[in-house]
């Protein structure tokens, strides 16, 4: 099979899944535009802001994508490109899309609150607090790691820093103008075209005016930006920046697809399936943990139930944003695999070791895009900049999500400190930023990062658990959620067990203990969920009832 044929077949499968399986899932969730969404019910102009579906899709897609659907699939090709593609398609359709949409709808039916609150309402208060501590700790780790990555990227490539600063300025102007445009569709289209054109121009301009600072300064600037992006109205900075940035990824996908069809490069990699890898371990569970965002990722549930659910204008918009957004990401993951299977197995192994996944992705797609007449160096730089731009999106979105998590944890607290943390977004964001700085300064984030893959997929399993219990409690057959849930628990518990034992043998006791704690946490939440189902009979959903 040729590379264009693989891409075409994958696209047809994903589109068909949206139209066919998507329809079944939409009916199971009883998505109804007559239901009032949290963005209208709790509209505050800061976090709850009803927005156009294309804008929310841009925010959501930019937030969940990042480098995840690029790095994970490329590393997973170690086990063979055929199992990688199969899991991307099967996982994206039956696991990831259901997980993302389910998290979004469950949140919208629970005042736009996070998975933690859904756990509290359906499993119990203890379950909520445990989940909140876990998700908050994970978000602080992600903020620290990405602040470090972006600061180093800006040092190594000052042009990316310049372009990123220009993007932020453009986003603020776009967000301000968009407020005055309101519901005038034609004017919105015009400012979108101008905004996207300027953004692509700023890619070029940024490279011409590199902006260089030292690591320490970039670190504090980035976290100051993350603070501002977390407390300002979502429609002023975060949402328009993500919306405009999403067109970088759309452009990347379009140019890459055309380039692959036009170049029709030979697939040099063999079809061998490796059950084990010396560096990674066994295909099960490593493949399913490594591909992550390309098929299913727990981080998506935090975004879907955190920022996105508060911006959905009508429930029907969640179809394309939640279910459709995941399938687009799966297609990007297929493109990532395509970018490296034009290499032989030996060339792939060597490049993965020496260059890393992002450079391999940039070089592979850049060479194919160059066949369209685009200078190869420019094409490679464009791909690399696109990936870097989305790292900044992950940073600011995670800061806002961590703020939501901290506020929800103390929601209903009667003591003065708890009330302040729950009600004051400036104080809660300040704590998030300070904790992130402390983790960076300690250097502990480099020690903890290896466990993120397993922790991320555990988040997915726990989100599916919360969605399943919620559905069962409101008399809905949750089999389509339970099957992915059981599989993801099997994957994550196996992965955590292996990870704990391996690090114990290597005397990396901190990682071993953390893995064991996460293993126990998941068991406790499963037991709490089982007890909650045994203790209370199914009840009809209040407000937005299912048929």
What do these predicted regions represent?
Residues 2-19, 76-107, 116, 161-171, ...:
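Extracellular loop-to-transmembrane helix junctions
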Residues 13-70, 282, 286:
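Membrane-interface "cap" regions at the ends of multi-pass membrane proteins
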Residues 67-74, 91-93, 99, 103, ...:
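Membrane-helix boundary/coupling elements in multi-pass transport proteins
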Residues 2, 68-70, 82, 141-158, ...:
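Transmembrane helix-loop junctions in multi-pass membrane proteins
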Residues 125-140, 324-330, 375-379, 392, ...:
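Loop-to-transmembrane helix boundary motifs in multi-pass membrane proteins
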Residues 260-274, 327-363:
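Extracellular/periplasmic helix-exit of transmembrane alpha-helices
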Residues 23-49, 75, 85, 89, ...:
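Flexible loop linkers connecting adjacent transmembrane helices
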Residues 49-110, 121-125, 142-156, 320-347, ...:
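Membrane-interface helix-loop-helix modules in multi-pass membrane proteins
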């Amino acid at each position: 099979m040729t590379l264009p044929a693989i891409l075409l077949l994958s696209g047809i499968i994903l589109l068909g899944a949206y139209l066919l399986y998507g329809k079944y899932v939409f009916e199971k969730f009883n998505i109804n535009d007559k239901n009032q969404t949290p963005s209208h019910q709790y509209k505050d102009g800061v976090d709850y802001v009803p927005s156009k579906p294309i804008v929310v899709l841009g925010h959501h897609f930019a937030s969940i994508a990042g480098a995840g659907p690029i790095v994970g699939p490329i590393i997973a090709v170690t086990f063979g490109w055929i199992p990688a593609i199969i899991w991307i398609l099967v996982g994206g359709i039956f696991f990831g899309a259901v997980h993302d949409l389910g998290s979004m709808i469950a949140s919208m039916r629970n005042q736009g609150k996070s998975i933690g609150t859904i756990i509290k309402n359906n499993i119990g208060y203890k379950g909520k607090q445990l989940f909140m501590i876990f998700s908050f700790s994970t978000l602080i780790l992600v903020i620290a790691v990405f602040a470090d990555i972006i600061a180093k990227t800006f040092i190594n490539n000052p042009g990316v820093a310049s372009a990123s600063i220009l993007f932020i300025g453009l986003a603020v102007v776009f967000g301000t103008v968009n407020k005055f445009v309101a519901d005038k569709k034609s004017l919105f289209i015009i400012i979108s075209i101008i905004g996207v054109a300027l953004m692509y121009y700023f890619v070029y301009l940024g490279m011409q005016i590199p902006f260089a600072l030292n690591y320490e300064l970039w670190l504090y600037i980035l976290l100051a930006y993350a603070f501002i992006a977390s407390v300002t109205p979502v429609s002023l900075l975060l949402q328009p920046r993500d919306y405009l940035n999403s067109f970088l990824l759309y452009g990347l996908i379009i140019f890459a697809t055309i380039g692959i069809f036009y170049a029709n490069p030979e697939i040099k990699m063999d079809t061998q399936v490796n059950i084990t890898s010396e560096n990674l371990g066994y295909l099960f569970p490593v493949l399913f943990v490594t591909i992550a965002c390309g098929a299913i990722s727990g981080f998506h549930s935090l975004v879907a139930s955190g920022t996105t659910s508060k911006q959905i204008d009508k429930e029907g918009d969640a179809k394309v944003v939640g279910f459709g957004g995941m399938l687009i990401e799966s297609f990007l993951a297929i493109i990532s695999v395509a970018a490296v299977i034009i290499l032989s197995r030996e060339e792939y192994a060597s490049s993965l070791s020496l260059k890393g996944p992002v450079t391999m992705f940039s070089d592979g797609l850049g060479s194919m895009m160059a066949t369209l007449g685009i200078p190869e160096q420019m094409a490679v730089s464009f791909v690399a900049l696109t990936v870097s731009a989305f790292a900044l999106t992950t940073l600011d979105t995670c800061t806002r999500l961590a703020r939501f998590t901290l506020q929800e944890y103390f929601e209903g607290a009667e003591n003065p400190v708890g009330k302040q943390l729950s009600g004051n977004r400036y104080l809660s964001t300040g704590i998030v930023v300070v904790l992130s700085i402390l983790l960076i300064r300690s250097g502990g984030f480099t020690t903890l990062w290896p466990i993120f893959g397993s922790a991320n997929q555990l988040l997915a399993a726990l989100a599916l658990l919360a969605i399943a219990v919620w559905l069962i409690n409101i008399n809905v057959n949750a089999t389509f959620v339970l099957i992915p849930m059981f599989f993801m628990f099997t994957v994550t518990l196996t992965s955590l067990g292996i990870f704990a034992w391996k690090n114990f043998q290597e005397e990396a006791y901190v990682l071993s203990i953390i893995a064991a704690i996460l293993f126990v946490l998941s068991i406790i939440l499963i037991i709490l969920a089982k007890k909650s189902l045994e203790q209370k009979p199914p009840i009809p959903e209040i407000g937005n009832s299912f048929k």
